[in-house]
A protein has these predicted regions:
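Non-heme iron-sulfur electron-transfer modules
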Residues: 1-10, 38-63, 84-111, 138, ...
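Ferredoxin-like iron-sulfur electron-transfer modules
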Residues: 6-27, 51-73, 153-171, 176, ...
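Single conserved hydrophobic/aromatic residue that forms the stacking wall/gate
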Residues: 401-402, 406-413
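FAD-binding core/adjacent interface of flavoenzyme oxidoreductases
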Residues: 138, 149, 153-171, 187, ...
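Rossmann-like dinucleotide-binding cores of NAD(P)H-dependent redox enzymes
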Residues: 193, 197-228, 232, 287, ...
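Cysteine-centered iron-sulfur cluster-binding motifs in ferredoxin-type domains/subunits
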Residues: 21-38, 64-84, 138, 173, ...
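Fe-S ferredoxin-like electron-transfer domains
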Residues: 86-192, 196-197, 204-211, 254-257, ...
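Rossmann-like dinucleotide/flavin-binding elements
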Residues: 170-194, 234-244, 263-266, 282-338, ...
Length: 413
């Protein structure tokens, strides 16, 4: 007769995604080597070991802190020889853990996230997604803030008020700049951050939709960094309002430049100057900054990255009846995180694979349609993805109001 534990393990194995493949994935370690959380937490997290635990002893895996430390970046999936989707395997186990009431492992994981990962409220909102396992995200964010405030009070009690290791300037208040400022201040440096825009946050404020990251959460993250002693000076463009010589004169011993890539690359096809075409980064920035944006009922988004998914979902929330994403390769080559694409489709976004725009068509200087062409996949290019090759004679036309989302962003010159 099977024990209750054996019965539970059998049930988990029968339901577990890619269970058979798991038996053969314990040798290369690519998942661990490519994991960003491993870089931050070290020995506290190892996805390969967690995967082995799920196969050998799933009941023990349900009570493991590690189960809750995957941040959904899919770097492991993109590099895995068997293309295992570890985030989705771990999500399956998280849901079972939630159903069985195994909440303490998550509480332990939350402590590690808050104490070791910069901008924990942002990463919990945008990366870890506890709500996907049936947990209350808002309640978790409150707990995370309480943990961090307690940590800050302890730090203030133990450390001197003034930094002891000199001054460093940081240019840009996006994720990179804020992370560097956070890390340097914790190590005893005096940090001044310069931001060209009126408010700090960079791409966090500019382009992540409000349904993914609220302004309230971002404000709390920035205030926490200020409470560490970091000075943030907005409305100052280094190179225009002051130069590097000024930074040295002010006593900064080093400068970190984290200005990001805020410019979209333009599609080099005919008709790109027509009204009604807007780049996705500009579109999201207009929405986040409170500007009125008028869209049509039929919207097309070009590109297969995460920005394209955000633009498409935001457009639906603004009232579009139909939103279609055009991507020139297949789903397997899509740069967007697979779960983001799935959520977009679940919300009603249609994704057309192996389709590329050929030219924009217009009436009265306003875009009215796209002439598209179907593609086929060839040999891999320098990125490792298979090349998209046009199929001669496969052109067709889509009527639209258009949002253009180039596949890459360009550095600011």
């Amino acid at each position: 007769m099977e024990t209750s534990t054996a019965t539970a393990s059998k049930e988990i194995h029968e339901r577990l995604l890619d269970a058979e493949k798991l038996k053969y994935c314990f040798e290369c370690g690519i998942c661990t080597a490519s994991c960003s959380i491993v870089e931050l937490l070290g020995k506290d997290y190892n996805p390969r070991v967690l995967l082995e635990k799920i196969l050998v002893s799933p009941e023990n895996a349900l009570t493991s802190d590690e189960l809750w430390l995957c941040a959904w970046c899919y770097r492991c999936h993109k590099r895995c020889p068997q293309a295992l989707k570890l985030p989705e395997i771990f999500l399956f186990m998280r849901k079972i853990a939630t159903q069985k009431g195994h909440t303490q492992p998550f509480e332990n994981a939350l402590q590690k996230i808050v104490k070791n990962i910069p901008l924990p409220l942002v990463t919990l909102s945008v990366c870890f997604h506890p709500e996907r396992a049936g947990l209350d995200k808002e309640e978790i964010l409150v707990k995370a803030e309480e943990i961090r405030e307690k940590s800050l009070r302890t730090k203030k009690a133990k450390t001197a008020a003034k930094p002891s290791k000199g001054k460093i300037a940081v240019i840009g208040t996006g994720p990179a700049g804020l992370t560097v400022a956070y890390g340097l201040s914790r190590r005893g440096y005096g940090v001044t951050v310069f931001e060209a825009l009126p408010e700090p946050g960079g791409m966090l404020r500019k382009c992540i939709p409000k349904h993914r990251l609220s302004k309230k959460i971002l404000a709390k993250e920035i205030q926490f960094i200020k409470d560490l002693g970091v000075e943030i000076r907005t409305g100052i463009k280094v190179g225009k309002d002051l130069n590097f010589e000024d930074l040295w004169t002010e006593g900064h011993g080093a400068v970190f430049v984290g200005v990001g890539a805020h410019k979209s690359q333009k599609l080099k096809i005919d008709g790109g100057e027509l009204r009604g075409i807007i780049h996705a980064l500009d579109f999201l920035w207009n929405i986040n900054s409170g500007q009125k944006v008028e869209i049509g009922k039929n919207v097309v988004v070009i590109g297969g990255g995460n920005v394209a998914m955000d633009a498409a979902k935001t457009t639906l929330r603004l009232g579009a009846n139909e939103v279609t994403i055009l991507y020139r390769r297949s789903r397997d080559e899509m740069p967007a995180i697979p779960w983001e694409a799935k959520e977009a489709e679940d919300e009603g976004v249609k994704i057309e694979f192996l389709v590329s725009p050929k030219r924009f068509l217009g009436e009265n200087e306003t875009v009215s349609a796209i002439e598209c062409i179907r593609m086929q996949l060839g040999e891999p290019d320098e990125t490792g993805r298979r090349q998209a090759i046009p199929i001669e004679g496969s052109e067709f036309t889509l009527s639209l109001i258009h949002i253009s989302e180039p596949t890459r962003q360009a550095e600011i010159s």
